[in-house]
């Protein structure tokens, strides 16, 4: 089973250029998905990545890579990964819904003015 890394291109603590290169070096065969992961709270203070749908965070990229390496060595449970994937998708869906409602609310306020 191919490893999958999810990294955010919007969070302040994530340097996408260096992190992507380091993850590619760690596992050249892994799938890397870049985009908002709806993990904004921790993403303001820590660099993070989702590894096989499991969130990992650290204060530095080097610390994060140590955690990623340890996670990759652990045996994978397909059922657990599927549960985590669904949870991550639901979290993203809720964030998109909140963003949509906020945009609608702001548009209504502009229309009133």
Curated annotation (Swiss-Prot):
The keyword Coiled coil applies. Residues 74-105 have a biased composition (Basic and acidic residues). The keyword Coiled coil applies. Residues 78-113 form a coiled coil. Residues 69-113 are annotated as: Disordered. InterPro entries: DUF1450, UPF0741. Keywords: Coiled coil. Pfam families: DUF1450. Belongs to the UPF0741 family. This is UPF0741 protein SH2399. It comes from Staphylococcus haemolyticus (strain JCSC1435).
């Amino acid at each position: 089973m191919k490893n999958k890394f999810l990294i955010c291109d919007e969070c302040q603590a994530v340097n996408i250029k260096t992190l992507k290169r380091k993850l590619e070096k760690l596992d050249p065969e892994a799938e890397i998905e870049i985009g908002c992961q709806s993990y904004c709270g921790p993403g303001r203070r820590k660099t993070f990545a989702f590894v096989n749908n499991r969130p990992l965070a650290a204060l530095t990229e080097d610390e994060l890579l140590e955690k990623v390496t340890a996670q990759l060595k652990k045996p994978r449970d397909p059922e657990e990964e599927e549960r985590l994937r669904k949870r991550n998708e639901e979290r993203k869906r809720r964030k998109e819904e909140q963003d949509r409602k906020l945009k609608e609310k702001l548009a209504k306020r502009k229309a009133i003015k």
